[in-house]
């Protein structure tokens, strides 16, 4: 692999291309997440239409149906909507755990110089929206402040679905930045959920959960992918984490962290983490997340006082955090990084491109809705939170589309250049002749 460290005295380029293997991996992720984002949008639209139709009562009845009333002893007498949030999203977070470990072991995040930009941007994109939300809700205080983390999340599947719709050929360096930013964003979201949105904490079940997680890790470290052993261990780990009061999706992340990234034998084409990610990402993007979106997005606006909704400090804080906070946090932190270091934008990238990507990061659908449910579960603000997340994400998507559509011609020129392979060795020329 070509050394990407710039020579002394040369400015480091922000959003430069990754290596060719990393580019191929990102392309595979993009295809799956874009398709999944389309299904996510479809699920959300169906839920909204159904919940606001004359048959809205049947939607509510379906979401509140408890398939296993006898599971109360294990606290598993959950309705379908909760099973989607706690159960199916564990698959999503398992893939996130695999992705995180891969990025830190073999991806861009293993290099501190390349990791600095997405990490700083993700932190900025978390702090500023949270501050905006707190600022708006500070006078209200009390329960309102529990929602501070709602506008801090980015939904990469939704963002990529928007990109697919507007047809933008986003440069490879920016695609890598957007995906890596989302990975770091997911890590921060997992940390926030585990620390700030834990219910009645019980230490014993959490300690017991370490046993099936350790056995799961022992098997995968030895490359034993017996589904009849791994899936029951994962279910037991999920059940114990759920019983502990920590949100059950954290079990998915911990299981993902145990999977080895590097190839075990010389003949292996891929590490086990990449293999499992390739197998489970379609399940996550094509089923788990769309079903969660279907149950989470069904907010009924019939009979609602729209004036009261749009002036609710919770709604204003979430929308402002997603639309303004993400842009100020990501764009601002990147600008400051370039301003106070020798870093500069890659030749193919403009600050307008970064503005569009920063707006895309304001689409905070899946994890924002999840945090909203944890912060205001069963409360009067629950529907307002859903409406705010949907509204803020829609505004961010529209603004990003306006900015990025104007750059389409330039994107196409870059895309053509990134496909040129003059010596026909299967590796485009731009990945062989990079000046960092």
From Swiss-Prot:
It catalyses: Na(+)(in) + 2 H(+)(out) = Na(+)(out) + 2 H(+)(in). GO terms for cellular component: plasma membrane. The keyword Transport applies. GO terms for molecular function: sodium:proton antiporter activity. Belongs to the NhaA Na(+)/H(+) (TC 2.A.33) antiporter family. Keywords: Antiport, Cell membrane, Ion transport, Membrane, Sodium, Sodium transport, Transmembrane, Transmembrane helix, Transport. InterPro entries: Na/H_antiporter_dom_sf, NhaA. It comes from the Bacteria. Na(+)/H(+) antiporter that extrudes sodium in exchange for external protons. GO terms for biological process: regulation of pH. Signal peptide: none annotated. The chain crosses the membrane at residues 35-55, 80-100, 116-136, 147-167, 176-196, 201-221, 226-246, 283-303, 313-333, 354-374, 385-405. It is a multi-pass membrane protein. It is found in: Cell membrane. This is Na(+)/H(+) antiporter NhaA 1. The lineage of its organism: Bacteria, Bacillati, Actinomycetota, Actinomycetes, Micromonosporales.
């Amino acid at each position: 692999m070509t050394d990407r460290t710039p020579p002394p005295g040369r400015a480091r380029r922000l959003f430069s291309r990754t290596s060719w293997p990393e580019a191929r991996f990102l392309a595979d992720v993009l295809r799956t997440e874009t398709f999944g984002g389309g299904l996510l949008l479809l699920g959300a639209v169906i839920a909204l239409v159904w919940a606001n139709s004359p048959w809205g009562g049947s939607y509510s009845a379906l979401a509140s149906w408890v398939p296993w009333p006898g599971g109360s002893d294990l606290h598993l007498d959950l309705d379908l909507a909760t099973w989607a949030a706690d159960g199916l999203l564990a698959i999503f977070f398992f893939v996130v755990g695999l992705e995180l470990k891969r990025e830190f072991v073999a991806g861009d995040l293993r290099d501190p110089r390349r990791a600095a930009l997405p990490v700083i941007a993700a932190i900025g994109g978390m702090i500023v929206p949270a501050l905006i939300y707190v600022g708006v809700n500070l006078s209200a205080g009390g329960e309102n402040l529990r929602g501070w983390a709602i506008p801090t999340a980015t939904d990469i599947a939704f963002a990529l679905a928007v990109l697919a719709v507007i047809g933008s050929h986003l440069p490879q360096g920016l695609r890598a930045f957007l995906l890596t930013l989302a990975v770091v964003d997911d890590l921060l979201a997992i940390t926030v959920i585990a620390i700030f949105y834990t219910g009645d904490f019980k230490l014993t079940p959490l300690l017991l959960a370490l046993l099936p997680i350790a056995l799961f890790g022992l098997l995968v470290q030895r490359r034993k992918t017996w589904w009849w052993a791994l899936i029951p261990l994962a279910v037991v780990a999920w059940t114990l984490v759920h019983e502990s009061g920590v949100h059950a999706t954290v079990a998915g992340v911990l299981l993902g962290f145990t999977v080895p990234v590097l190839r075990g034998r010389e003949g292996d084409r891929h590490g086990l983490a990449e293999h499992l990610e390739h197998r489970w990402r379609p399940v996550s993007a094509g089923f788990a997340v769309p079903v969660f979106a279907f149950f989470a997005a069904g907010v009924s606006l019939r009979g609602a006082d729209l004036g009261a909704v749009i002036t609710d400090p919770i709604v204003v804080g979430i929308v402002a955090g997603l639309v303004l906070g993400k842009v100020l946090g990501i764009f601002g932190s990147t600008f400051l990084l370039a301003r106070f270091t020798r870093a500069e934008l890659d030749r193919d990238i403009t600050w307008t491109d970064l503005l569009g990507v920063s707006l895309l990061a304001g689409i905070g659908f899946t994890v924002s809705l999840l945090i909203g449910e944890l912060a205001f579960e069963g409360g009067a603000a629950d529907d307002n939170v859903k409406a705010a997340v949907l509204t803020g994400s829609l505004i961010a998507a529209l603004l990003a589309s306006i900015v990025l559509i104007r750059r389409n011609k330039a994107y196409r020129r870059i895309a053509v250049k990134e496909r040129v392979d003059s010596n026909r060795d299967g590796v485009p020329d731009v990945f062989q002749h990079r000046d960092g």
